[in-house]
């Protein structure tokens, strides 16, 4: 089965072609980072308009790279949520229009299920069951995964997502958007031990997260430095390191608890923050000590992309899931509502 995948949930326009027998044939991505950087964050209206501008050229590019014509495509998968409604509607409308014109089905895919399954595009994919850490700008969740569509929520953030905390902390210190990579870059030059940040909700049982207090702690630390006349680059680096260490250790502690609770030794990390090198090193060490395994997608498939949507859609269509003819998107969409295969 050959599936065209379209991703437009936020500020990346992603298109890909995935074949159930040959694997990923082509993928293309346009990031709107430069468009939104001047505003310090994503502007939904601008995001939607840019998706309209980029979608068809990217589809043509992917078809050309794969040496494919529309008559060879068996189905279209598109992101139906969660995400920005206007942005989602661009992808959904395009998918349904092309599906009608080409006489093929179009299936709405859950954005976070796409992220969760992205490591399965790698040469050594994880086997079910496993525990997944979904960590991005909009989500921080621990999920027990027994199969596609068989998801049990173990824990989630009670306020800010980890990626959101990275971005907001970076913005407080005057760093560029998106803040996550900027924090990680500065942390490499930070001096360990100058600042000690708390590990939120690690001093009590449970698998939920909270990052708003950590963000406030970072703000107060930065303001104290500025008040003392130290708004230097080194101060930013030291705060970035302390902040990143706190987030990474918190995520690692919770993942270890989740694995023990589920009785598993396989961990999948997915979402934009899963590209963070310090997080990968920490989780690899933890799983190594447990004699377990950790899986993640290649860096370009950690952030939003069309490949994960094409793959997830292909799995569901092959299992017999029927497409909906309605153009329906959801800004909020709990993964537990997805049907099991």
UniProtKB/Swiss-Prot annotation:
PANTHER family: TRNA N6-ADENOSINE THREONYLCARBAMOYLTRANSFERASE, TRNA N6-ADENOSINE THREONYLCARBAMOYLTRANSFERASE, MITOCHONDRIAL. HAMAP family: TsaD. Its EC number is 2.3.1.234. GO terms for molecular function: iron ion binding; N(6)-L-threonylcarbamoyladenine synthase activity. Its cofactor is Fe(2+). It comes from Pseudomonas fluorescens (strain Pf0-1). This is tRNA N6-adenosine threonylcarbamoyltransferase. Fe cation binds at residues 111, 115, 304. It catalyses: L-threonylcarbamoyladenylate + adenosine(37) in tRNA = N(6)-L-threonylcarbamoyladenosine(37) in tRNA + AMP + H(+). The keyword Membrane does not apply. One of its GO terms (cellular component) is cytoplasm.
């Amino acid at each position: 089965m050959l599936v065209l995948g379209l991703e437009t949930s936020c500020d990346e326009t992603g298109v890909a072609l995935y074949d159930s027998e040959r694997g990923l044939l082509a993928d293309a991505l346009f990031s709107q980072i430069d468009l939104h950087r001047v505003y310090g964050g994503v502007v939904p209206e601008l995001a939607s308009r840019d998706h309209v501008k980029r979608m068809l050229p990217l589809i043509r590019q992917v078809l050309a790279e794969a040496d494919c014509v529309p008559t060879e495509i068996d189905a279209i998968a598109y992101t139906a949520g969660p995400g920005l409604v206007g942005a989602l509607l661009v992808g959904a409308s395009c998918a349904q229009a092309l599906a009608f014109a080409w006489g093929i089905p179009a299936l709405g895919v859950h954005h976070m299920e796409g992220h969760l399954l992205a490591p399965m595009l790698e040469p050594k994919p994880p086997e079910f069951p496993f525990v997944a850490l979904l960590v991005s700008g909009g989500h921080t969740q621990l999920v027990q995964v027994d199969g596609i569509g068989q998801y049990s929520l173990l824990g989630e953030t009670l306020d800010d997502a980890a990626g959101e905390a990275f971005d907001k902390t970076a913005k407080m210190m005057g760093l560029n958007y998106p803040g996550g990579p900027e924090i990680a870059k500065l942390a490499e030059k930070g001096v360990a031990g100058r600042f000690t940040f708390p590990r939120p909700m690690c001093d009590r049982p449970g698998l939920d997260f909270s990052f708003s207090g950590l963000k406030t702690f970072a703000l107060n630390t930065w303001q104290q430095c500025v008040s003392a006349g130290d708004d230097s680059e080194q101060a930013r680096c030291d705060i970035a390191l302390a902040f990143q260490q706190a987030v990474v250790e918190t995520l690692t502690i919770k993942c270890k608890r989740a694995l023990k609770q589920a009785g598993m030794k396989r961990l999948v990390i997915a979402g934009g923050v899963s590209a963070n090198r310090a997080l990968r090193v920490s989780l690899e060490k933890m799983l190594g000590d447990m004699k377990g395994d950790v899986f993640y997608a290649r860096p370009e498939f950690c952030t939003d992309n069309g490949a994960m949507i094409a793959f997830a859609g292909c799995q569901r269509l092959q299992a017999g899931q029927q497409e909906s003819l309605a153009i329906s998107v959801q800004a909020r969409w709990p993964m537990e509502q997805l049907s099991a295969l």
